[in-house]
Amino acid sequence: TRRLSARWTFEAAQDAESMHGVDVEAEIMQALAQEIVVEIDQEIIGSLRTLAGAGTTLDFSSLSGTSIYVGDRHAALAIEINRAANRIAARTRRGAGNYIVVSPEALTILQSASTSTFARTTEGSFEAPTNTKFVGTLNGSIKVFADNYAADGTKVLVGYKGSSETDAPAFYCPYIPLMSTGPVMDPSSFEPVVSFMTRYGYKELTNTASSLGNAADYVDAVTLSNVAFQ
């Protein structure tokens, strides 16, 4: 269960409407709903990163060969992601990794790589009510999602999701997606209060006693070190 609430004053709502034409109630309700979605996103992504473990490390300072400019070195990330995707295929016998979740830093590397086949999504497709956005496709088959809350140095999450609902490393099962009380009056302060609640289950099949215990086979990771952009 996840709950979130907020309150405001009638004076603030009246002044905002009069001076700026802003509906404070609508803005707060939208912000609360967005915050719950963000928290669920971050919980799931964090759990998958933990499930993936350390993965492999790509040290940009130890790359061999003669590079022309920094974009040549950045191209190594796409190769390492392909290796991680193929490791998933070998472990699961289902398919290669078909999505990645990257930090803004890793996204910049993919965008600036000289030989990477990263195709950006068209403008307008970025809009979504989450903090994790679909930003393009790598090598024609791997969907790229950017986690805007990820700090520099956050490892790249590589995962596989099959065509069926059960062909996945983890399961998010909402049974009360989002419930709102609507604005209610606090009799002690004469302030409107609004609350949101969601209830869901989240499960990773890691226990071999009750399942195949192969959830970790569906995910991998690439850790970046000594990243340079010049």
Tell where the protein language model's regions lie, with residue ranges.
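Generic detector of intrinsically disordered, low-complexity, polar/charged segments
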Residues: 50-52, 58, 62, 68, ...
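Extended, solvent-exposed, turn-rich assembly/linker loops in the middle of proteins
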Residues: 57-126
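Sequence/fold signature of self-assembling virion shell proteins
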Residues: 2-13, 17, 22-26, 30, ...
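Intrinsically disordered or highly flexible coil/loop and linker segments, enriched in small
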Residues: 3, 15, 37-54, 87-98, ...
